[in-house]
Amino acid sequence: MQFSEQWLRSWVNPALNTEQLSDLLTMAGLEVEETVAAAPAFSGVVIAEVKECVKHENADRLRVTKVDAGTGELIQIVCGAPNVAVGVRVPCALPGAVLPGEFKIKPTKMRGVESNGMLCSGKELGVPEDVDGLMLLPADAPVGQSIRDYLGLDDQLFTLKITPNRADSLSIRGIAREVAALTGAELKPVAIEPVAPSIDDVRPVKIESRQACGRYLGRVVKGVNAAAPTPAWMRRRLERSGLRSISAIVDITNYILLEQGQPMHAFDLAKIDGGITVRQARAGESLLCLNEKTVELQPKHLVIADDAKPLAMGGIMGGEHSGVTVASHDIFLESAFFAPEAIAGKARELGFGSDSSYRYERGVDFALQRDAIERATRLVLEICGGQAGPVVEEVAELPKRQAVQLRAARVAKVLGVAMSAERIGDILSRLSLSYTLADEVFTVQAPSFRFDIEIEEDLIEEVARVYGYNNIPADAPRSGMRMLAQPEDKRPVDQLRHLLAGRDYQEVVSYAFVDERWERDFAGNDNPIRLQNPIASQMSVMRSTLIGGLVDVLAGNINRKQPRVRLFEVARVFLRGGNGFDQPEKVAGLVWGPRLAEQWAAKSERVDFFDVKADVEALLHPIKAEYRKAAHPAFHPGRCAEVRVDGKAVGVIGELHPQWVQAYGLINAPVLFELDLAAAIARGRIKAQPVSKFQPVRRDLALLVDEAVTVAQLLSAFAAKRAEIVADIALFDVYRGKGVAEGKKSLAFSVLMQDNSRTLTDEDVEPAMQALLEAASELGAQLRV
């Protein structure tokens, strides 16, 4: 909403400058988007009357004038405006004046004739003006007075961003009421005296749509001069509020809208057949609106109709046929209350709106209609003349205000400020919120203009606004937090996330609601936990594995031409359990594409099972896991392993099944893992080990074993018989081919031995190696020579 600061200060004038007033309104919830000057800066311009005006002897289009500018003598000024004439009063820039754009006025000669000033147009002063030529002022404009003072050009224009719940602030009356409440300044509203009827003419009013229209007032005014000019003061206020002047009657209704907040409409009485009825539109009816758009009316549309036809769309826009023109002599003034729910959304459906619909759909004061019609009638009689008939009023169903309770203790708790009941009561009174008080509990009745007071929190907000948010102390809350001991056998989940991110994985977060197909394909789950009210058909069950979500993200990245994808997710899965549902946490990862990002130093190779196995080992470190061949519906039958810790299965690792690679359009198979989060964050009791200062000894052990014997079996056998000096055993080569019999394979292990107290000798090393060889022989292994 845009309005003039001077207009507001005629209602309430707090001891604040423009900037302070702007800040006050913003902090009270009426955000000031901008303030701009009503006119650009200029000086030295006064009101002057043209006393003489003759044709310039050397120029056909110039006039030589002598003007009275209140200086005590006539001033000669050469002027080229077409509307300059004897007797007109106009703005006059005297020598030394500075006009917008730093244009300085000084004595000069024009075609040989001396000119000591400049007669100004509105454009030259930066003031909107419809007249082509000089700005013509009223005949009673005081000669010699500064034009800035006379036109109020030192005004500031405020633009407020009013929230939808504060329709009561969409008027000068409403904003002034707020400023008075916030500052304690005296509110000086316009006195509204009822206009005594001087004629008996009426038009009967009937409300059929009683829930949509709670109150309707109408008044006949006859013998008006609709062509009368709108007073300059009213025109200025309208223009500074963003509305253009149209005609006196229309300007008056718009003025009431801005001043009082009550939308009004004026009908040409001669175009009304019979009485006025507020009803729903009927099938087949249409209306040509004031914006020259024809609306095919529907029963959901509220209309103002006479005995023969619709005249206007209630609360939205009047009709072109029944509108007032400068030729109108008799008018019918309308002032009504329409329920917000009856108007809301209708203008947007039609593709156009109005200032009236904007206010009605947010809520207009349902006690304001009579004041508005009396104020409008008074202005019509003063500006356009005429005789007014009595006001006809019909009341249907008006909103009912429920009392709201406000506890003083609750105010203190929410705002963090101890406030006495007297202080709270004073704030409520300043906001026109009537109340009764008993046992520190206020029972508050909201006024007719406040549609947003419904619950206790609404009242607490009002108290806070007037008390001032800046006055609420910024007290930091006292916390009872204390540092908790961190268990040594577990690590934080965030540390696990950082570890995976450090290994070039990117974390994803996916929905726990998944496609039923994913559960069947990746978990072999034919009885997933179903949602009673899924948000989409493809999100109808709860996941029991994280694999489906990772595969889906991979498919999306492949479609976007990503060459290399490494993902992980930490989240819950949902399983059926003996006592209902279990929600264990899992960590899962997926790797697809080249092992390394494209570079010149290494050949591009696809990631494989063992790359991801290394990531899993790093994830579980220092705990050693055992890997056993396994079958899983999501994984390749021959490239899948169960991850076991202390003899218990804690996860699975493998290459995605070729069937799902093809079904989900993945080009080639990713390698995935999924682990119980509890196993992934466990790290065992850390035991400090001294660093030996003696050189280690390495021996290699090459064994021929059957294809069925796994590395894990051999490592397990070694562990049972390894000597104390054996620090580490690692596989470094697997060979099949020439020199190795069919059905056999060669496995080569490096054995690292070290003692913390001495250098090892062959006498120490050989028994240790022999013990390992004996352990391997129990699995049918032979030393390869």
Curated annotation (Swiss-Prot):
InterPro entries: aa-tRNA-synth_II/BPL/LPL, B3/B4_tRNA-bd, DNA-bd_dom_put_sf, Fdx_antiC-bd, Fdx_antiC-bd_sf, NA-bd_OB-fold, Phe-tRNA-ligase_IIc_bsu, Phe-tRNA-ligase_IIc_bsu_bact. Its main location: cytoplasm. Residues 692-784 form the FDX-ACB domain. Binds 2 magnesium ions per tetramer. Residues 399-474 form the B5 domain. Its cofactor is Mg(2+). Residues 39-148 form the tRNA-binding domain. NCBIfam families: pheT_bact, YtpR. Tetramer of two alpha and two beta subunits. This is Phenylalanine--tRNA ligase beta subunit. It comes from Chromobacterium violaceum (strain ATCC 12472 / DSM 30191 / JCM 1249 / CCUG 213 / NBRC 12614 / NCIMB 9131 / NCTC 9757 / MK). The gene is pheT.
